[in-house]
């Protein structure tokens, strides 16, 4: 084989290698699968990983697209197992041209989460939804209440994999989630239920101490 032929073969092999590497990188970096999650006809959620978890640093960015079909507003998006508070974990980046609210959620990339995501295991997430109920009759003002939507996030291995799916069971309740996370985000050291319990104990024990003190005073005199 002549020197020119050898050079042509080497260039061809190099181009094939570069093309294969680029294709693999592109398929690993961009996951644009959008899986819709409907919730009682009020809204639906689509999930999108822009960067793979194995290439991420401390956090993996997940884009959640939420379209509202009724009154209300999304107050927070939270993925369980994350050390960040609710208020610091998500970013509202505005509304897209097709009517979706884009929420950028940062999922903590610990070794446990990386292993779970790569093995296509679900990460449990919650969406806190402030529902607005307009009474049908009368001049009663709008009623607002919180609703918690549970869903799973899966890191896709191929374009047909679901990013967002329904959980098998509800792992959290609104009260527990708000007490455990929102209170910490606002700097409240204890939940309302704990404070109420302490106050109740004090109210029961305090009269007993007063009675004992009075009896001791009478006995000494």
Swiss-Prot record:
It is found in: Host membrane. Glycans are attached at residues 19, 179. It comes from the Viruses. Keywords: Glycoprotein, Host membrane, Membrane, Signal, Transmembrane, Transmembrane helix. Residues 24-191 are extracellular. The chain crosses the membrane at residues 192-212. GO terms for cellular component: host cell membrane; membrane. Residues 213-221 are cytoplasmic. It is a single-pass type I membrane protein. Residues 1-23 form the signal peptide. Coiled coil: none annotated. This is Putative transmembrane protein ORF25. It comes from Ostreid herpesvirus 1 (isolate France) (OsHV-1).
